[in-house]
């Protein structure tokens, strides 16, 4: 593990400090304090323990490194440069925080090789890492130690541990006994406002211990103490937290230990003083050859480990299944869904779309054995568990269903981690009203382009008596506002099946399924192999020369169809458009959109706010929906009370003809 002397290891750490100082100074912005404070911990971790191969950055059995304290991004960029990642040359370091550079202010997944997750919103990294560590154990249970046997390491700061999401993650990681998860806490006792004591008195080690973690402490500037703590953590069957007592901005003689060094350049004079204090006499952005060689040995060790793993993979009888899962090969799903849709159109079941989702999951999970489901303690309501799914439990990771507990935010972040890890395809459910508890992680799913599926049930006043605390009103508009998120609100069992096909075959877009509690009739009774939901919106009823176009989503589509019948009885030709996914419709060619929407006046209908309907409706068009919060009553009474009815659609249509 350790193959160089202590003095050289210190110089390796000082190379990180120098690059962090210089890059932040050149950018005139950034966070030098954390990289300088945690350089010793990170150097020991990479030099003696962590296994990665920069020449094969996606190697499945690499160790995962998550910089939860993402503001300290120069720590990660400096390490990747020193390790020899091909896309992290010195020009990238010089271009820190500049437009078009891979070295963004906070690490962004996909911008550079080896960045495992986008971090920056504090706490997201540690919670995502729980998902990664869980994925490692689940895959290990499927494929064995020869193919899956690695650690997930996290560097987290005080801010990460103060954020509420970290408590959900700590609880979940400890409960499941994720022994391959090691959190290195940057215990510098500094926040942006000052000493951490001005805002917290918590012994940060205590919550970890209470949740079943193995808790250690070390001097974060004493390499042998750091190494001993990591070694002990690796041996323990529990997840581990190591409190690394550090000095923020270590090496800057006049600023270290203070909050001013957290998020601002040191300045030329302080950098010169730091160079003298550290014994670093090299010009800015210059690393001596022997240090490149020392860091290169780490990369070479990783390459050897990867080559040995490749040999084991070639000889493994599980190779085909492993490679199919790693490639996320979903080719078996579309034909299975097409055949299933034909049965649905013939049988025309009247079921809630949450029930239709459960039915579709029977097809999905049979076609895709690497799909893994779960719910935030609402399995019986979300209906996210299909027949035959086995629960994941502490020490028993061979199953495919995860009980996330009442931890919506932690669930969403963990699903990001499972998806980022690779080899598994996660989905998880909660009530639509609680999407707000998941929102920061949903936003990161979209920002990273990670194909996670969020199952949101009880989608409107249609849930009835639970009342306005549980009735989504503004949620559809706010979720549709997130770029690169496909929000799909299907109207029947056929559209629900199509929505699942879209979600599970997506490669760079998360999907959020919006599902009803109340039963809905099948409106797609004529089978089409084509996935019409993938169009975003389509003509469900075309009367030819239309006088008005009625547009609806989800449970309100049956109201639009009823309104069209009422209008037809009066000799008024109304087209009906089903619009399950605004984002997919916006991506269609302009001529298709024009054909679907037509030139006649339009009326939209959705049991939610009108906000976000500009794609379909102009100021002159009508909308039948909600204008405020809901109420507690049976669903039919609520639809009447809030005037979301076929008659209201007819009235709005006639006013515009």
Swiss-Prot record:
Thiamine diphosphate binds at residues 71, 120-122, 159, 188, 262, 434. Binds 1 Mg(2+) ion per subunit. Can also utilize other divalent metal cations, such as Ca(2+), Mn(2+) and Co(2+). Its EC number is 2.2.1.1. The record marks 31, 262 as: Important for catalytic activity. GO terms for molecular function: metal ion binding; transketolase activity. It catalyses: D-sedoheptulose 7-phosphate + D-glyceraldehyde 3-phosphate = aldehydo-D-ribose 5-phosphate + D-xylulose 5-phosphate. Its cofactor is Mg(2+); Ca(2+); Mn(2+); Co(2+). Substrate binds at residues 31, 262, 354, 381, 458, 466, 517. Keywords: Calcium, Magnesium, Metal-binding, Thiamine pyrophosphate, Transferase. It comes from the Bacteria. Homodimer. This protein is encoded within the form II ribulose-bisphosphate carboxylase operon. Belongs to the transketolase family. PANTHER family: TRANSKETOLASE, TRANSKETOLASE 1-RELATED. This is Transketolase. The gene is tklB.
């Amino acid at each position: 593990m350790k193959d160089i002397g202590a003095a050289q290891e210190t110089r390796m750490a000082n190379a990180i400090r120098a690059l962090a100082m210089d890059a932040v100074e050149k950018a005139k912005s950034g966070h030098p304090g954390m990289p300088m404070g945690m350089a010793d911990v990170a150097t020991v971790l990479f030099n003696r323990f962590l296994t990665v191969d920069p020449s094969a950055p996606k190697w499945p059995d690499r160790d995962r490194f998550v910089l939860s304290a993402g503001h300290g991004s120069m720590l990660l960029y400096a390490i990747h440069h020193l390790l020899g990642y091909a896309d992290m040359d010195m020009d990238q370091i010089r271009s820190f925080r500049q437009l078009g550079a891979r070295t963004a202010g906070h690490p962004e997944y996909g911008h550079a090789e080896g960045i495992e997750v986008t971090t920056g919103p504090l706490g997201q990294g540690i919670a995502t890492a729980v998902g990664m560590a869980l994925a490692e154990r689940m895959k290990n249970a499927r494929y064995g130690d020869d193919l899956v046997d690695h650690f997930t390491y996290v560097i987290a700061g005080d801010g990460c541990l103060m954020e509420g999401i970290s408590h959900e993650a700590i609880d979940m990681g400890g409960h499941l006994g994720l022994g391959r998860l090691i959190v290195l806490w940057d215990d510098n006792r500094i926040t942006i406002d000052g000493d951490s004591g001005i805002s917290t008195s918590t012994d940060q080690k205590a919550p970890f211990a209470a949740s079943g973690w193995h808790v250690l402490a070390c001097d974060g500037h004493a390499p042998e103490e750091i190494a001993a703590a990591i070694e002990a953590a690796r041996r323990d069957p529990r997840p581990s937290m190591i409190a690394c007592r550090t000095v923020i901005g270590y090496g800057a003689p006049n600023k270290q230990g203070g909050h001013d060094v957290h998020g601002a350049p040191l300045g030329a004079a302080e950098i010169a003083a730091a160079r003298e204090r550290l014994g670093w006499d090299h010009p800015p952005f210059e690393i001596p050859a022997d240090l490149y060689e020392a860091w290169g040995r780490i990369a070479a060790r990783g390459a050897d480990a990867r080559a040995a793993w490749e040999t084991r993979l070639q000889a493994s009888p599980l190779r085909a299944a492993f490679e199919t899962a790693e490639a996320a090969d979903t080719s078996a799903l579309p034909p299975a869904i097409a055949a299933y849709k034909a049965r649905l159109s013939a049988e025309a079941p009247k079921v809630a779309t949450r029930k239709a989702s459960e039915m579709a999951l029977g097809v999905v999970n049979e076609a895709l054995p690497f799909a893994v489901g779960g719910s935030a303690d609402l399995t019986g309501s979300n209906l996210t568990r299909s027949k035959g799914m086995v629960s994941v439990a502490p020490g028993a990771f061979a199953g495919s269903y995860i009980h996330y507990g009442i931890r919506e935010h932690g669930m969403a972040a963990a699903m990001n981690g499972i998806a980022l890890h690779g080899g598994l395809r996660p989905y998880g459910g909660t009530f639509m009203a609680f999407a707000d508890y998941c929102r920061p992680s949903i936003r990161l799913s979209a920002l990273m382009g990670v194909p996670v599926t969020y199952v949101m049930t009880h989608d409107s006043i249609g849930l009835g008596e639970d009342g306005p605390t549980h009735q989504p009103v503004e949620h559809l508009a706010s979720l549709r506002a997130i770029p690169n998120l496909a929000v799909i609100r299907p109207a029947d069992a056929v559209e629900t099946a199509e929505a699942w096909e879209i979600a599970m075959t997506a490669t760079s877009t998360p999907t959020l399924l919006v599902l009803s509690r109340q039963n809905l009739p099948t409106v797609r009774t004529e089978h089409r192999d084509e996935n019409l939901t993938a169009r975003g919106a389509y003509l469900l009823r075309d009367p030819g020369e239309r006088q008005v176009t009625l547009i609806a989503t989800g449970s309100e589509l049956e109201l639009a169809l009823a309104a069209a019948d009422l209008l037809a009885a009066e000799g008024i030709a109304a087209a009906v458009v089903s619009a399950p996914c605004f984002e997919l419709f916006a991506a269609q060619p302009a001529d298709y959109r024009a054909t679907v929407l037509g030139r006649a006046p339009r009326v939209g209908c959705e049991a939610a706010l009108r906000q976000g309907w500009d794609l379909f409706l102009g100021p002159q068009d009508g909308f039948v929906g909600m204008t405020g919060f809901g109420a507690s009553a049976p669903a039919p009474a609520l639809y009447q009370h809030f005037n979301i009815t076929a008659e209201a659609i007819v009235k709005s249509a006639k006013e515009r003809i």
